[in-house]
Amino acid sequence: MLWVVLAVVVVLASVLVLLRQSSGLLALLWHDVVHQRLLNFFTGLSRPQRILKAVQKNATKGNPESVIAAIDHYCRHSEWAMNVGDEKGLILDSVVTEVNPSTALELGTYCGYSTVRIARLLSPGTKLITLEFNPDYAAIARQIIAYAGLQDKVILVEGPSGDLIPKMKQQHGIKSFDFVFLDHWKDRYVPDTKLLEECGLLRKGSVLLADNVICPGTPEYLKYVRNDPRYESRYFKSNLEYTKVEDGLEKSVFLG
C-alpha cells in the first residue's frame, strides 16, 4: 500500500513540475508549498538559510554583483525563491538608475536580493530604508547585505509596514521618498501607498515600482494607480522570477 501512495506522490509531483513553468498558480504551489517543504525537511534548513549558504559559498565578499549572480544561479538552477529575479531585476536597475534617488524605500526585504540590487546603484551618501515584517528573513538579509559590503547604505527596519511608515519622518528624518519599491504582501500595496500619501512621504515626481502585479497579481493596486489622476503609470511586461510565467512591474509616477 505504501508503494502505491509513493507512486501517486511521484506522479503528482511530476505533473506539477511539467506545469509549473506555464501556470502561475501551479508554479507558486509547487515552489512555495511542495518543493520548499521537501527541502526544509531533508536539509533541516529554511529556504533563506539555504540561499545564504549559496552566497557564502559562491560569492565574493564585498562584491554586490557576485552576490546577485550567486543568488540568481542558485534560484534558477537549484531552488526557486521570491526575489524580483534576474529578468525583472534589470527593469528595477534601469528605473533606479533613471530616478537616481536621494531617498529610497523598499517594502519587503525578504533575503536582501533586491536590497542589494538597489543599494549598489545608489549615489554616495544615499541610504535605502528597507522594511521587513519577518524577523527570520531580516536576520538572513542583514548577513547577505553585509556580505555584499552594502551595510552602510542600508537601514533595515523590522515590523509591520503599516506601523513603520508613519514613523519615517520622525525616526529617520525623511521628508519624502524619491523612489519606493513595493515587493511585500500584495494586499498591502494599496493601503501602504495611501499611507505614504497621507504621511506626506510622496512628493511630485516620486516613483513607485511594484513587483508581481500579474503573478500572483495585485488587481486592486493596478486599478488604484491607473485610475487615480495623481499617478502616471506604465506596465513593464516580464516573467515571474526564474520561470516562463508572465509577470511584470508597474511604474507609477506621483504627480502630486
Curated annotation (Swiss-Prot):
<dbReference type="GO" id="GO:0005576">
    <property type="term" value="C:extracellular region"/>
</dbReference>
<feature type="binding site">
    <location>
        <position position="183"/>
    </location>
    <ligand>
        <name>Mg(2+)</name>
    </ligand>
</feature>
<protein>
    <recommendedName>
        <fullName>Catechol O-methyltransferase A</fullName>
        <ecNumber>2.1.1.6</ecNumber>
    </recommendedName>
</protein>
<feature type="binding site">
    <location>
        <position position="212"/>
    </location>
    <ligand>
        <name>substrate</name>
    </ligand>
</feature>
<dbReference type="Pfam" id="PF01596">
    <property type="entry name" value="Methyltransf_3"/>
</dbReference>
<keyword id="KW-0325">Glycoprotein</keyword>
<keyword id="KW-0128">Catecholamine metabolism</keyword>
<feature type="glycosylation site" description="N-linked (GlcNAc...) asparagine">
    <location>
        <position position="58"/>
    </location>
</feature>
<keyword id="KW-0489">Methyltransferase</keyword>
<keyword id="KW-0531">Neurotransmitter degradation</keyword>
<keyword id="KW-0732">Signal</keyword>
<comment type="function">
    <text>Catalyzes the O-methylation, and thereby the inactivation, of catecholamine neurotransmitters and catechol hormones. Shows highest activity towards catecholestrogens and dobutamine. Also has lower activity towards L-DOPA, dopamine and epinephrine. Active towards the xenobiotic compounds methyl-DOPA, carbidopa, isoproterenol, and apomorphine.</text>
</comment>
<dbReference type="InterPro" id="IPR002935">
    <property type="entry name" value="SAM_O-MeTrfase"/>
</dbReference>
<feature type="binding site">
    <location>
        <position position="114"/>
    </location>
    <ligand>
        <name>S-adenosyl-L-methionine</name>
    </ligand>
</feature>
<keyword id="KW-0949">S-adenosyl-L-methionine</keyword>
<keyword id="KW-0964">Secreted</keyword>
<dbReference type="GO" id="GO:0032259">
    <property type="term" value="P:methylation"/>
</dbReference>
<keyword id="KW-0808">Transferase</keyword>
<dbReference type="GO" id="GO:0016206">
    <property type="term" value="F:catechol O-methyltransferase activity"/>
</dbReference>
<dbReference type="GO" id="GO:0042424">
    <property type="term" value="P:catecholamine catabolic process"/>
</dbReference>
<feature type="binding site">
    <location>
        <position position="212"/>
    </location>
    <ligand>
        <name>Mg(2+)</name>
    </ligand>
</feature>
<keyword id="KW-0460">Magnesium</keyword>
<feature type="binding site">
    <location>
        <position position="84"/>
    </location>
    <ligand>
        <name>S-adenosyl-L-methionine</name>
    </ligand>
</feature>
<feature type="binding site">
    <location>
        <position position="183"/>
    </location>
    <ligand>
        <name>S-adenosyl-L-methionine</name>
    </ligand>
</feature>
<dbReference type="GO" id="GO:0042417">
    <property type="term" value="P:dopamine metabolic process"/>
</dbReference>
<feature type="binding site">
    <location>
        <position position="132"/>
    </location>
    <ligand>
        <name>S-adenosyl-L-methionine</name>
    </ligand>
</feature>
<dbReference type="InterPro" id="IPR017128">
    <property type="entry name" value="Catechol_O-MeTrfase_euk"/>
</dbReference>
<dbReference type="GO" id="GO:0032502">
    <property type="term" value="P:developmental process"/>
</dbReference>
<feature type="binding site">
    <location>
        <position position="186"/>
    </location>
    <ligand>
        <name>substrate</name>
    </ligand>
</feature>
<comment type="similarity">
    <text>Belongs to the class I-like SAM-binding methyltransferase superfamily. Cation-dependent O-methyltransferase family.</text>
</comment>
<feature type="binding site">
    <location>
        <position position="241"/>
    </location>
    <ligand>
        <name>substrate</name>
    </ligand>
</feature>
<feature type="binding site">
    <location>
        <position position="211"/>
    </location>
    <ligand>
        <name>Mg(2+)</name>
    </ligand>
</feature>
<feature type="signal peptide">
    <location>
        <begin position="1"/>
        <end position="27"/>
    </location>
</feature>
<dbReference type="GO" id="GO:0000287">
    <property type="term" value="F:magnesium ion binding"/>
</dbReference>
<dbReference type="InterPro" id="IPR029063">
    <property type="entry name" value="SAM-dependent_MTases_sf"/>
</dbReference>
<keyword id="KW-0479">Metal-binding</keyword>
